[in-house]
Amino acid sequence: MTMALLGTLLLLALFGRSQGKNEELSLYHHLFDNYDPECRPVRRPEDTVTITLKVTLTNLISLNEKEETLTTSVWIGIEWQDYRLNFSKDDFAGVEILRVPSEHVWLPEIVLENNIDGQFGVAYDCNVLVYEGGSVSWLPPAIYRSTCAVEVTYFPFDWQNCSLIFRSQTYNAEEVELIFAVDDDGNAINKIDIDTAAFTENGEWAIDYCPGMIRHYEGGSTEDPGETDVIYTLIIRRKPLFYVINIIVPCVLISGLVLLAYFLPAQAGGQKCTVSINVLLAQTVFLFLIAQKIPETSLSVPLLGRYLIFVMVVATLIVMNCVIVLNVSLRTPTTHATSPRLRQILLELLPRLLGLSPPPEDPGAASPARRASSVGILLRAEELILKKPRSELVFEGQRHRHGTWTAAALCQNLGAAAPEVRCCVDAVNFVAESTRDQEATGEELSDWVRMGKALDNVCFWAALVLFSVGSTLIFLGGYFNQVPDLPYPPCIQP
């Protein structure tokens, strides 16, 4: 008995499965034996097929700025009513859904109009779901590469406005009408739908808004009914952390090195120029890296490119300043004359404005040495001419302040001296005059060096202010370049 009961149950199960399969097969033959997938599902030619469209974004893959191409992964939800596929589940043993290949069913041929690679279709032709009552649903996946005009003015603190435009490739506005799908509450889904559980966030771009709009185009004549398309706008904002860490921070640090040239002495013009030129070369490398990232356009210059050009101009001015300061510091009295006005500005006015104390002047520091050397020469001459011991001459010289009497007595004695002695005196006078000229020349050289140093200090503060203010203004422009508040709900709901 037990074995007979098990056999009966097995036969009933197999019979039930075969009946289920036969019902789906019967339904398929019932619907598609006389079905033509090339004809629109309308009873009269003037009728319009209403197409419900819903786009679900699963991944914002990338935005290639250089090629101006947006790559996205989406699901295209398309629904319509086909009266030829109408059936009742009561007639087919409760079968409510029939899955058939997409090539067996009429399709509205919804394509991405602004694609860039010529791939108008979907990535996978999945089955079409035919529901009771003639409702047809198709949800194919697609990876689209669409055009996106990239605005690089505020790169890398920019946001972009990209669009996905869907339309029927074959049918006009009178034959096919595109509308938005509705949610469970009956509200139109007039934006790109994003399921946060299945959405993969992009590491470079954040999606702020993704509204949709249906556009109607009038025909050029009365016989042309026009067209209808659905445009989904993606407002995406760049996440600048990668560029801040890898480009902006190194660029600012390297650019700041050009100011270190002012900490070298004013006479070290060669080393200062070397530092500035090395910074220029480094900035050129950064500019080349940016040029490889952004599109080749002459409509605008990116913010980071403007900053690099600004810093290169500052570095060029610093190189010119180093050359001018070196030229001033190495001047001599034999080649250049110092005007009183220039001395007043560079040696008095500028040091006072910059808080630089002038070097202390000690006029009595060099005079005793010169007087001592002169007295020694005079004593040797008197010892030779007057035939007096040196100790006596020194004793006599101490009775008169600074050797004044000795010099006068020597002049009287030289009147009766021999011509050879006069030659010696002339030689001594020449040596003294040369010494005074050298001391005066040394003072002039010192003044030129001080003027070069004052000019160098002025240029340092000017370059520091220019570099700081210019960098701040340029990057503030990127900071205030925010996505405007649009009258749309956020694309990704928290």
UniProtKB/Swiss-Prot annotation:
Topological domains, Cytoplasmic: 265-272, 329-457
Transmembrane segments: 240-264, 273-291, 307-328, 458-481
GO molecular function: acetylcholine receptor activity; acetylcholine-gated monoatomic cation-selective channel activity; transmitter-gated monoatomic ion channel activity involved in regulation of postsynaptic membrane potential
Keyword Glycoprotein: yes
Extracellular-facing ranges: 21-239, 292-306, 482-494
Disulfide bonds: C148-C162
The keyword RNA-binding is annotated on this UniProt entry: no
GO biological process: acetylcholine receptor signaling pathway; chemical synaptic transmission; membrane depolarization; monoatomic cation transport; monoatomic ion transmembrane transport; regulation of membrane potential; skeletal muscle contraction
Highest taxon listed in the record's lineage: Eukaryota
Record note on quaternary structure: Pentamer of two alpha chains, and one each of the beta, delta, and gamma (in immature muscle) or epsilon (in mature muscle) chains. The muscle heteropentamer composed of alpha-1, beta-1, delta, epsilon subunits interacts with the alpha-conotoxin ImII.
Protein's recorded name: Acetylcholine receptor subunit epsilon
Annotated source species: Rattus norvegicus
